[in-house]
Regions:
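Helical segment within the ABC ATPase nucleotide-binding domain
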Residues: 36-49
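Catalytic Walker B motif of ABC-type/P-loop ATPase nucleotide-binding domains
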Residues: 22-26
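A short, surface-exposed alpha-helical micro-motif characterized by mixed small hydrophobic
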Residues: 63-65
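Hydrophobic anchor residue at the start of the ABC signature
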Residues: 11
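ABC ATPase nucleotide-binding domain "signature motif"
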Residues: 1-8, 33
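H-loop (His-switch) motif in ABC-type P-loop NTPases
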Residues: 56-58
Length: 149
């Protein structure tokens, strides 16, 4: 069996166990693109009020639309713990138009991206990778916004 086939078998077994809390460590590593799509569909159908899934991953793009809450850890502990709704209400993500107001900026092939305080209540798409980079680069500013210590 290939790594991807073994991973699919493990995931199928885990979901079939129908446990109230399922812990998944890097669940999409080794899966091809169609299998990742199937994984997202299965996971979306699995979670309900009686079942929770905790995912540890570096492949945030594979699961970011499925998340209700995000916890970012660093060597000092919990750097951020918030719901996706809370994050999007307090922060905005996008192109760096106002660098002076940005908490964090980074240059990409698509241009400069930023995280800034959402003081004008703009509705932007959560970018977990950008959030992670902002949190690790400017932990104190993020902690102050979310009242984390």
């Amino acid at each position: 069996m290939s790594m991807g086939q073994r991973k699919k078998a493990y995931i199928a077994f885990a979901l079939a166990c129908n446990v109230s809390m399922l812990l998944l460590d890097e669940p999409t590593n080794g899966l091809d693109i169609p299998s990742k799509s199937v994984f997202r569909r299965l996971l979306a159908g699995y979670v309900d009020d009686s079942r929770m899934v905790v995912i540890s991953t570096h492949q945030v793009a594979d699961v970011e639309r499925l998340l209700d809450s995000i916890v970012i850890l660093d060597n000092m502990g919990v750097a951020l713990a918030a719901t996706t709704q809370e994050i999007c209400s307090k922060l905005k993500f996008g192109h760096a138009n106002e660098r002076a107001r940005a908490i964090y900026t980074e240059s990409t092939i698509a241009g400069d991206l930023s995280v800034s305080i959402n003081d004008d209540y703009e509705d932007t798409m959560l970018n977990i990778e950008l959030l992670f980079n902002a949190t690790t680069a400017n932990r104190n500013a993020i902690a102050a916004i979310f009242n984390n210590k």
